[in-house]
């Protein structure tokens, strides 16, 4: 049957329908279908239309199903059957049918956009008419408040969109809006800046102007303090940026944060210059914890005005924790060193410091008598000369020396103090230089033996220390956490000696120690009564039977990395000399 014949049949059928002669139209189209050896979906669509006009929905649905059966890639059958199901009151079945149609219909079908639009419209109508279980009328307020406080901020906003009653109840709880966390905001939300400003203004009203924490506000495209946040300046104590700020005027970035004079904690993942950092620190006098993880130099270092902001005679800062990490893509300038030195001189209460290594860092700590409790040194690998850590505060409980990139190695040895006993040091993590000289080895060994109260020890790239393991661990009787990964020289005798000297060990990591076999593994398990977990990743000499025996005793044994597609722990980037 060609297109002209189909067109003639349609015109004659429409004539019957216009005169409301449903029986004549039905007889005509049915006779045509019976006479046609291979009826097309056009004929069944015409008859379904006639059935629909005459109110015979069940018969019309059968013809619509025949249309889908004849050509499942054509949208007309799904549109016809979906409409009939809705007329019969089966909205859910129609919704499922439209979903199936969107999967099956060809992308080039001209009616596919119509099918998609009809599906979306039906879905919206189902959501509007769907009965909502009103938990706010069933559960007590205290129970609901406890539940909502476990949700993240995005989930709370979604709950407000369920219905008007939910929104009215939630916005009456100021405690739910003390922390505005926009870290889950969609990247597209930056395009709706004005709407976002109004939303933040509403949250400020809901919180009774008591917002205490803001996270990721830059994801909403808001680069300056809004009126909503300025209302709550007196209460804002935590501000975190988690993504870069795309702005032309980087020299004006400090205006975003300086109005919040009551800030206690400031975390900035946004690249900011030293001048901006100095203005923030000088304006927010009550800052106790600052994390600057991507500091970049000013365009013209010599024109910076921060060199007079901090010194020993200025008003001391309230800082207790400082993370000060520079961006390595930019060359080092001597004024960066002076900036950190001045900052330390104005921070007498500092207890935690994480910073890129600088030559006079230890001298500044000693000069200004800073009683640090935790010191983390980031080695940038810029210089190959020996780096001085010969002075460490007696108040220090945690010391970490690590490379800027976990997959890299330390490019030079560190000089540790050996003339004093580190009585307060409890946690120690060291990445060692791979080519230690004998003097450097002696220095590290003396330092480790002086830390006799250590409870946690992590040694990376410790191959050079293997001959001294007996001396080192004999001095660490209180050790509870030990990690010596990537040491191919670690043998059964060393493991047994560690077991005898450190009976309180609860966690041990011997990963990539290929010389350790099943007998040494069993000896460690039997000797350490407090042991709860042991890692032996890539220790192929330890048999499966020994591992199964350990697990049968309730021991947690890790034999494979939990990170997908991760490289072996011993694989490092080594700069060849």
From Swiss-Prot:
One of the GO biological process terms: donor selection
InterPro entries the record matches: F-box-like_dom_sf (IPR036047), F-box_dom (IPR001810), LRR_dom_sf (IPR032675), TPR-like_helical_dom_sf (IPR011990), TPR_rpt (IPR019734)
SUPFAM superfamilies per record: F-box domain, RNI-like, TPR-like
Pfam families in the cross-refs: F-box-like
Compartment list: Mitochondrion; Nucleus
GO MF annotation terms: ubiquitin-like ligase-substrate adaptor activity
Chain positions of TPR repeats: 6-39, 41-74, 76-108
UniProt keywords, alphabetically: Mitochondrion, Nucleus, Repeat, TPR repeat, Ubl conjugation pathway
F-box domain span: 138-180
Any one GO CC term of the record: mitochondrion
Task of the protein: Has a role in substrate recognition in the Skp1-Cullin-1/Cdc53-F-box (SCF) ubiquitin ligase complex. Required for the maintenance of telomere length and transcriptional silencing at the telomere. Also required for chromosome segregation.
Quaternary state and interactors: A part of the E3 ubiquitin ligase Skp1-Cullin-1-F-box (SCF) complex. Interacts with cul1, mcl1 and skp1.
Protein name: F-box/TPR repeat protein pof3
Lineage of producing organism: Eukaryota, Fungi, Dikarya, Ascomycota, Taphrinomycotina
Gene coding for it: pof3
């Amino acid at each position: 049957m060609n297109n002209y014949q189909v067109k003639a049949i349609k015109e004659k059928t429409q004539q019957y329908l216009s005169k409301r002669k449903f029986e004549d139209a039905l007889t005509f189209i049915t006779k045509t279908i019976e006479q046609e050896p291979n009826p097309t979906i056009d004929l069944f669509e015409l008859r379904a239309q006639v059935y629909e006009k005459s109110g015979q929905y069940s018969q019309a649905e059968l013809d619509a199903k025949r249309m889908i059966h004849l050509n499942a890639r054509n949208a007309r059958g799904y549109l016809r059957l979906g409409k009939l199901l809705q007329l019969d009151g089966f909205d859910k079945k129609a919704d499922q049918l439209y979903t199936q149609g969107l999967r099956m219909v060809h992308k080039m079908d001209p009616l596919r956009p119509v099918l998609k639009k009809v599906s979306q419209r039906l879905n919206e109508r189902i959501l509007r008419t769907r009965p909502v279980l009103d938990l706010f009328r069933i559960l007590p307020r205290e129970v609901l408040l406890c539940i909502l406080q476990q949700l993240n901020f995005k989930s709370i906003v979604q709950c407000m969109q369920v219905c008007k009653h939910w929104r009215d109840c939630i916005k009456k709880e100021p405690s739910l809006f003390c922390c505005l966390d926009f870290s889950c905001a969609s990247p597209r939300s930056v395009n709706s800046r004005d709407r976002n400003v109004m939303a933040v203004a509403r949250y400020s009203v809901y919180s009774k102007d008591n917002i205490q924490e803001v996270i990721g506000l830059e994801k909403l495209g808001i680069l300056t303090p809004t009126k909503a946040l300025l209302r709550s300046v007196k209460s804002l104590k935590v501000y975190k940026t988690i993504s870069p700020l795309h702005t032309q005027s980087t020299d004006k970035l400090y205006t975003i944060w300086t109005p919040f004079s009551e800030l206690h904690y400031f975390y900035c993942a946004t690249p900011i210059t030293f001048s901006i950092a100095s203005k923030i620190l000088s304006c927010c006098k009550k800052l106790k914890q600052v994390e600057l993880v991507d500091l970049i130099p000013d365009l013209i270092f010599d024109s910076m005005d921060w060199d007079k902001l901090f010194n020993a005679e200025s008003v001391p800062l309230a800082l207790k924790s400082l993370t000060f990490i520079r961006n390595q893509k930019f060359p080092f300038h001597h004024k960066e060193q002076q900036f950190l030195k001045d900052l330390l001189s104005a921070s007498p209460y500092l207890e935690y410091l994480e910073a890129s290594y600088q030559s006079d860092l230890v001298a500044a700590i000693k000069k200004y008598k800073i009683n640090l409790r935790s010191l983390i040194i980031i080695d940038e690998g810029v210089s190959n000369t020996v780096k001085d850590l010969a002075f460490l505060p007696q108040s220090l409980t945690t010391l970490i020396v690590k490379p800027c990139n976990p997959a890299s190695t330390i490019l030079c040895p560190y000089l540790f103090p050996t003339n004093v006993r580190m009585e307060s040091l409890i946690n120690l993590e060291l990445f060692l230089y791979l080519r230690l000289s004998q003097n450097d080895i002696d220095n590290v060994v003396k330092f480790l033996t002086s830390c006799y109260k250590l409870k946690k020890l992590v040694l990376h790239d410790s191959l050079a220390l293997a001959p001294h393991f007996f001396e080192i661990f004999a001095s660490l009787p209180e050790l509870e956490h030990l990690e010596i990964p990537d040491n191919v020289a670690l043998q059964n005798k060393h493991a047994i000696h560690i077991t005898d000297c450190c009976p309180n060990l609860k966690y041990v990591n011997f990963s990539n120690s290929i010389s350790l076999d099943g007998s040494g593994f069993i000896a460690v398990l039997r000797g350490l009564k407090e042991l709860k977990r042991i890692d032996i990743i890539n220790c192929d000499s330890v048999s499966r039977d020994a591992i199964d025996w350990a697990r049968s005793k309730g021991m947690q044994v890790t034999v494979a990395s939990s990170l997908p597609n991760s490289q072996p722990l011993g694989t490092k980037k080594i700069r060849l000399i």
